[in-house]
């Protein structure tokens, strides 16, 4: 690949000056970055077979085209290996999809992060963590792919805290928020196969505008309904009507308990959908809906999401521990929805 | 370490000329459009603004549209309708 890289170049004396320049220009997320040299950027582009000026995505509301060159530069800065580049590109395609609705999750006071779920053989080949310490530091793929997406949002699209990003709290997932599904041990159909009809041998990423994970504990139940009953009780009360998606992440012990009862992911979704409704009276008393409580509000109920299919069920997390978690989506169904994108790997 | 070059990760925003309609000197007799963004009470706030623009500034009328949701620009039907039916638009968002 010899097409010219058109980005402006800055000569530096060494690593420290490069780092100082990146900080002074506001190009980092606060952590040090890898200096994006041309050879490193070329290696990223080669990994996806894209010319520097190829358009990866277009953010309509910002009228910004995201070129392969800029994705590659930011992926280098984030610390990605070139092999991760197809995953970064697919995630960028996902957040530029009109269904994801970039402007809202990127800008809102509601502080969504880009939850990124990797499925398929690429997850295992590149050592994306799907097990112990699922969201913790220590795995280069999880740490740097999410960081690369965030740096693209910052440096290319202008999603900068305090300016176009007005999050009230933000959350730690805005550094990186990436997991893989534990397909090797899961008894269930993988997420990408369920959502867009991929073959299990395909790889894909699912991006969801997401708040922080909320963990629950159930060490007592030996049944699917028992475990999920605790989940539903935990989900119901912090929930708000109209959220677009929830992601439910079932870790090893709960996964095995639920599967032993023969429940599929569809069964899990249906149970959660039916057991997380709240009364209109509850929503009004807790100021999630306007208006005075009327007698009929005590029996009128609302679900947390519009459809059971809006609940993403993922098998991931440590093998030990009677914990699982759920992750609320951001805002409303008309504002943003999870998007699954096939990862295009360069054929050898 | 020898000197080397690094590449700029940012993009220059694409510049495009934007022409604003001149603000009217007065709202007297003007037709007011109010674009409501679906957030709680945004309709009430804009209704109140519409009343103030009529009673205190002499606007002729005020009508309201509702966006699909608060995170997107006003949809095309609103823009097309507003072009035909009002002279001034007030859009509001509040958190």
Would you name each region that the model predicts?
Chain A
Residues 1-348:
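Non-transmembrane, aqueous-exposed alpha-helical and coiled segments at domain scale
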């Amino acid at each position: 690949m010899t097409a010219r890289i058109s980005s402006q170049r800055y000569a530096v004396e060494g690593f420290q000056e490069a780092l100082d320049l990146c900080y002074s220009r506001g190009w980092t997320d606060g952590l040090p970055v890898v200096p994006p040299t041309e050879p490193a950027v070329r290696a990223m582009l080669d990994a996806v077979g894209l010319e520097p000026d190829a358009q990866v995505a277009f953010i309509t509301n910002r009228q910004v085209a995201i070129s392969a060159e800029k994705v590659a530069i930011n992926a280098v800065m984030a610390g990605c290996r070139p092999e991760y580049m197809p995953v970064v590109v697919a995630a960028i395609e996902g957040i530029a999809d009109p269904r994801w609705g970039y402007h809202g999750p990127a800008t809102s006071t509601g502080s969504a992060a880009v939850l990124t779920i990797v499925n398929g053989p690429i997850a295992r080949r590149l050592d994306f963590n799907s097990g112990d310490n699922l969201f913790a530091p220590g795995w280069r793929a999880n740490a740097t792919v999410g960081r690369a997406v965030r740096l693209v949002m910052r440096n290319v699209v202008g999603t900068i805290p305090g300016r176009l990003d007005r999050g009230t709290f933000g959350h730690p997932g805005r550094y990186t928020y990436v997991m893989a599904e534990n397909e090797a041990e899961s008894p269930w159909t993988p997420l990408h196969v369920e959502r867009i009809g991929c073959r299990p041998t395909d790889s894909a990423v699912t991006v969801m505008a997401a708040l922080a994970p909320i963990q629950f504990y159930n060490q007592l139940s030996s049944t699917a309904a028992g475990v999920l009953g605790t989940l539903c009780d935990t989900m119901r009360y912090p929930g708000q009507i109209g959220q677009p998606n929830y992601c439910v992440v079932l870790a090893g012990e709960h996964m095995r308990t639920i599967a032993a009862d023969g429940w599929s992911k569809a069964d899990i979704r249906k149970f959660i959908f039916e057991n997380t409704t709240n009364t209109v009276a509850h929503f009004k008393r807790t100021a999630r809906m306007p208006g005075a409580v009327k007698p009929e509000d005590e029996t009128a109920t609302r679900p947390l999401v519009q459809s059971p299919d809006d609940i993403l069920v993922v098998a991931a997390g440590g093998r030990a521990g009677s914990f699982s978690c759920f992750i609320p989506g951001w805002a409303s169904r008309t504002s943003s929805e999870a998007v699954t994108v096939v990862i295009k790997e360069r054929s050898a | 370490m020898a000197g080397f070059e690094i590449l700029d990760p940012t993009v220059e925003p694409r510049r495009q000329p934007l022409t604003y309609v001149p603000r009217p000197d007065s709202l007297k007799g003007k037709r007011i459009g109010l674009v409501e963004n679906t957030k709680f009470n945004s309709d009430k706030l804009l209704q109140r603004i519409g009343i103030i623009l009529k009673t205190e500034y002499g606007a002729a009328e005020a009508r309201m549209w509702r966006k699909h949701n608060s995170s997107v620009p006003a949809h095309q039907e609103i823009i097309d309708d507003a072009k035909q039916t009002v002279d001034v638009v007030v859009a509001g968002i509040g958190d």
